[in-house]
Amino acid sequence: VNQHVGGVVLRSDNNNFVGPENALPELQQLISDLQKTRYDTSSAANYLRTYNPLLIGISQTENLLPTDQILNGITALPSEMTIGATWNTGYAEEAGSILGEELNALGINLFFGPSLDVLDSIQTDAGEKLGVTTFGGDPYWVGKMGQAYIKGLHEGGQYKVAVVPSHFPGIGNSDRLPEQEIATVR
């Protein structure tokens, strides 16, 4: 409280979600408690209530480990590669809209995604997971699909969900997930 925390990132490996059967109600309660604490402490020393809500962030892309945090209770969405393979920005926007609506309903207001990596080569070894977390290998179409997905997130989330696309240029061609080890890009 005294550290003036501006936000939190919720992750299943931090035990922010316990058990599949109660994950969503527990998550909503956790977020509500965090925001209430923020509200109560924002005005404790002031006569005027100046409340800025906490940023509650999460990574949630396609209901698969290790990139997703909430694995039960929300709509199962296709991977970015599946969406990208359609060459239809309408599908990307629709998937983003569904996710934005569900994140907003839970109280999550910061989304880490989608991946805007450009996959330069097919990987069949340890790095293959990167292949489904990108819209494809053409920079133009990855940009178009990402733009539509983000538009859907904003509209579905009633413009209450901020979006931070990931990762860095070239990481779509790395040999391992950056969350596991330092990736090598060749």
Regions inferred by a protein language model and the residue ranges of each:
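Enzymes and membrane/adaptor proteins characterized by extended Gly/Ser/Thr/Asp/Glu-rich
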Residues: N2-V142, H167-V185
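Anion (oxyanion) recognition and catalysis
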Residues: N104, H154-G157
